[in-house]
Amino acid sequence: MGLSDQEWQQVLTIWGKVESDIAGHGHAILMRLFQDHPETLDRFEKFKGLTTPEQMKASEELKKHGVTVLTQLGKILKQKGKHEAELKPLAQTHATKHKIPVKYLEFISEVIIKVIAEKHSADFGADSQAAMKKALELFRNDMASKYKEFGFQG
């Protein structure tokens, strides 16, 4: 399940492009998540009033949360699988406070790959996409394990 050094390099190379416009990427990812999977919006009390793409696009709060999401994910990805210290507090809040199901982590993982592929098609070919899928799967599996430690079946 682990990634090779080459796969981690592919993940971190494309992640550098994401970080060059983290607000734009984060906003696009959350907008797409809520549009493709409207049920996920139920977990975000402060975004429930955002029912149209126009409202989502205009929301500074949504943009700000997108930065938070991708900043945290970036910290985890940069650990190349050795992310226990970064993952544990994130899993704890997502399990005990926000109660985010693992299925929603799958949804956002799919959306992350779609959005990166749209924004960076020339730099995010099949090999890079496969590496990112593996990295996000590792993240989700480790989150699911931590969820169980916190008593959340998610």
From Swiss-Prot:
Domain of life: Eukaryota
Positions annotated to bind nitrite: H65
Main location: cytoplasm
GO MF terms, alphabetically ordered: heme binding; metal ion binding; nitrite reductase activity; oxygen binding; oxygen carrier activity; peroxidase activity
UniProt-annotated binding residues for O2: H65
UniProt-annotated binding residues for heme b: H94
InterPro entries: Globin (IPR000971), Globin-like_sf (IPR009050), Myoglobin (IPR002335)
One GO biological process term: removal of superoxide radicals
Any single GO CC term annotated in Swiss-Prot or TrEMBL for this entry: extracellular exosome
UniProt EC number: 1.7.-.-, 1.11.1.-
PROSITE patterns, A to Z: GLOBIN (PS01033)
Keywords of this entry: Cytoplasm, Heme, Iron, Metal-binding, Muscle protein, Oxidoreductase, Oxygen transport, Transport
Globin domain residues: 2-148
Major enzyme class: oxidoreductase
Family: Belongs to the globin family.
Subunit text: Monomeric.
Cited function: Monomeric heme protein which primary function is to store oxygen and facilitate its diffusion within muscle tissues. Reversibly binds oxygen through a pentacoordinated heme iron and enables its timely and efficient release as needed during periods of heightened demand. Depending on the oxidative conditions of tissues and cells, and in addition to its ability to bind oxygen, it also has a nitrite reductase activity whereby it regulates the production of bioactive nitric oxide.
Identification of the protein by name: Myoglobin
Biological classification of the source: Eukaryota, Metazoa, Chordata, Craniata, Vertebrata
Gene name of the encoded protein: MB
